Amino acid sequence: MPVDQSFNAPLSEVDPEIAAVLEQELGRQRGTLEMIASENFVPRAVLQSQGSVLTNKYAEGYPGRRYYGGCEFVDVAEQLAIDRAKSLFGAEFANVQPHSGATANAAVLAAIAQPGDMILGLELAHGGHLTHGMKLNFSGKLYDAAAYGVDPDTFLIDMDVVREKALAHRPQVIIAGWSAYPRHLDFAAFRSIADEVGAKLWVDMAHFAGLVAAGVHPSPVPYADVVSSTVHKTLAGPRSGVILSRDTALAKKLNSAVFPGQQGGPLMHVIAAKATAFKIAATEEFADRQRRTIQGAQILAERLVAADSTEAGVSVLTGGTDVHLVLADLRNSPIDGKQAEDALHEVGITVNRNSVPFDPRPPMVTSGVRIGTSALATRGFGETEFTEVADIIAETLKPDSDLAALRARVLTLTDGFPLYEGLTQ
């Protein structure tokens, strides 16, 4: 009996509704400026790896130790991903199987803590992450969570306060990492505090892993017991997670925490795409992109602290940035975070509203916006383009701005930097 006709038919014939969604989304990405700090554009080679026949293969276990036959080629793919991750970050151990950053984080905690243990991380409302102890998240339900925050005047993490919190709570795990904090973390100070209270130090570098890979951001690997990350964001790989460590003694616990602790079969097509992304991240081209990413964020921060923005009630948390994102503070502005997000969307710039520390507004409204530059650097933007983008954003955040004229300026930029040329879906 021949294969069903639908087996070899193109998506446009089998499922025109989904084909239309893909085409529309491609058009949206091409015709707008993507500035959500947790998003990026993956290289075409990563798309090709992920959209491959490896999606067909079940491979529970690890290379050379599978519970299924026929794994000789997916073993090669996973070992490449492991070796490349270790080389890229200078780690002794890597697990590339986590389906996401959240599952990687769940596995880390399962490996280095017991349910009911005390964990200490950055307060969610001050830039932390759900998986660092938020009460409605697994991390706040399974573990006893405490938090440190930022200084109310500088909005910086005060390591003396972190030490005081650690001495008061005596956590088994101290978490260094963030989802909305624009400065470097002092990994050496975190290490010292962890040692003082006998805690494990876990660094979640999901947002800045690409910067670390490029050597333009301090690496947490020499200081942390365990490092976790997503592979998208600044790394520009597939949406997924990775766990790293310099301590090979933790290898068995970490591997067991991922499989069978958190997951069953790994997604081999995604793991292959991770391997491709790690290879690209080791290139000078990638390093240049990360340098432009930081340059773009700093240009934006400088523009938003200029006199006209200040007069419009806009400021920048911490006064600038060391990384790929800027946090615009709108507490003194006539517009709130939701209104700013909507106005920027109208001109063709995609960002997300974001709470600022000590925010008087609710989380669905907020008094800030988080703006990232990774995707634009990937698209090829440099100093000239980022200067124009910064000016467009500054103008958009003013009351009564001409949004139609600003939209035209955005289209000039997108037209000059085509995305995924030749791709139709």
Curated annotation (Swiss-Prot):
Group of enzyme by EC: transferase
UniProt name for this protein: Serine hydroxymethyltransferase
Keyword Cytoplasm among record annotations: yes
A Pfam short name: SHMT
An example Gene Ontology molecular-function term: pyridoxal phosphate binding
Physiological role: Catalyzes the reversible interconversion of serine and glycine with tetrahydrofolate (THF) serving as the one-carbon carrier. This reaction serves as the major source of one-carbon groups required for the biosynthesis of purines, thymidylate, methionine, and other important biomolecules. Also exhibits THF-independent aldolase activity toward beta-hydroxyamino acids, producing glycine and aldehydes, via a retro-aldol mechanism.
Highest taxon of the lineage: Bacteria
Protein location: Cytoplasm
Gene Ontology BP term (one): glycine biosynthetic process from serine
Disulphide bonds in the chain: none
Residues annotated for (6S)-5,6,7,8-tetrahydrofolate binding in this entry: L124, G128, H129, L130
Alphabetical UniProt keywords: Amino-acid biosynthesis, Cytoplasm, One-carbon metabolism, Pyridoxal phosphate, Transferase
Record-linked PROSITE patterns: SHMT
Catalysed conversion reaction: (6R)-5,10-methylene-5,6,7,8-tetrahydrofolate + glycine + H2O = (6S)-5,6,7,8-tetrahydrofolate + L-serine
